């Protein structure tokens, strides 16, 4: 048995030391329980199962789960908390191959984002740490985490063959001052599956900026900006291909199903499917495709450098508020092609008079 503490690393046997184990971080036959970030950092490399027990992450530090040996299982236990500092984060970072990240019953990750929320998100005010960096977390699984009140962005995903299942991200306390609390931002990734997510937030529930073979299904999105592709363009990777967003609900959000591309940029959005999406209480657009984003804002002037082709909107149904627009399609000349439009019904709002270059078969 090994006991990891900031001032002691000992290997010994005896009943007296065994009795002291609850106060220490214990590793036995590859199973390790850590109660501090310093112990985790020094001991994680030798562990096949890591339990994180009531860890209080010091201000300005990352809970470092990078470089784990292949096949490691990480288990959050109790309540994980974070000290306050204005910095970029992330609060948690994980990488490795064939990693499983999960939690014990009753556990939660409480970011206490209200300490940072000022209504400005990432656009000014306090510098806010992002929550979870899942970069190079390949052939891995994140399952059942319950996350509360991220200061700003939630999961940043740049990985291959990563499955995220039954995750709760609850920023409902940030309705007034939370901003840019995106749940899942996906970029430069392949074979990503997000299944059964429950999200309460103030920005995109899902944003796919680049990547291929991505699935978001059985999701519930409340209070944010909806299910989004983009903005696509202006990055090092400007290709989105083979994305299926299905069997999901979008409630009390700005947008329902959205594709947005950057003004004057190049790239491609192909093989994207929105299927069986239920909308309720949408305040801006039920279905929206815009090719006019510049500096994060629409210009009303679409360009055609990003091709938006082989797109399916199927059974996107529900209601928007009376001040919202049911459907808005603003494409560049010749850039939106080969769309499938079937069984869509968005009602309750206004009909747009500003649609341009609507592809054959679609309605606006």
From Swiss-Prot:
Origin organism lineage: Eukaryota, Fungi, Dikarya, Ascomycota, Pezizomycotina
Pfam families, alphabetized: Glyco_hydro_28
One GO-annotated biological process of the protein: cell wall organization
Catalyzed chemical reaction(s): (1,4-alpha-D-galacturonosyl)n+m + H2O = (1,4-alpha-D-galacturonosyl)n + (1,4-alpha-D-galacturonosyl)m
Disulfide bonds: 32-47, 205-221, 331-336, 355-364
Family statement drawn from the similarity comment of this UniProt entry: Belongs to the glycosyl hydrolase 28 family.
Keywords: Cell wall biogenesis/degradation, Disulfide bond, Glycoprotein, Glycosidase, Hydrolase, Repeat, Secreted, Signal, Zymogen
Protein name, per record: Probable endopolygalacturonase B
Any Gene Ontology CC annotation: extracellular region
Positions of the propeptide segment: 21-29
Molecular-function GO terms, alphabetical: polygalacturonase activity
